[in-house]
Amino acid sequence: MSEQTGLSDDASWLQALLEKRRPDPGPVDGRWALGIGDMVADHSLTPDRLRWLVRKLNHFGGVAISEDAVEFDGDSVEWAEIEEIRTRSLIEYLFTGGVDKQIDKLPIPWFPFRRKVLGAISRAALTLLLAAAKQQLEGGALEIRIPAEVRYDGLLRTRELAPGMLAAVILADPAVRQCFEATASAHAVSVTPADDDVMDSADERADQIRSMLDAISARVRALSDG
């Protein structure tokens, strides 16, 4: 995600972490991952003695890209099984319920300051998504598209792997998207826009979109007050 100005302290911290942990350009070499465990471990409220342990929480939310597979929120699919990957605009992802699974509601085990740390990460993630979506809606940025549907060969039918809210924040970072798409290309997996993108008529639905963004803003304020 591109740098944003006027962010809250929580969002600025998360933005800095995303930039610090960006993958190298091109297809992934080995494995790259970033998730909720890394964020909890990096937060100032987390006791030092627990940082190594909370990193194991990444399977509750995050992204992993390896030479063999891609992983969203603990669910992994091998590149060899993937039929295609469809992208959606960040605004559409938000509009179609992508933020319904709040980070502070994840079934993460108790640890000291759990509520405060998860609340801070949730506020930060929502704020970054909201800032990017507003900038895009107002024409101030190029369209941000994230890999929203990883379609793969299931036992009986084609199945889909989709990112949760935290994974979407990570995938919205340009370096992560570039690494993801380059790795997909290296495995001859196509990455194409979804053909049923509901945002094709975004101009006609501007009021609805702004209403949705206002609702996300209200959720951020509620998390701040909680």
Summary of predicted features, one role per range:
Residues 76-78:
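Core beta-strand elements of the Rossmann-like FAD/NAD(P) dinucleotide-binding domain
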Residues 1-62, 71-73, 83-226:
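Eukaryotic intrinsically disordered, low-complexity regulatory linkers and tails enriched in Ser/Thr/Pro
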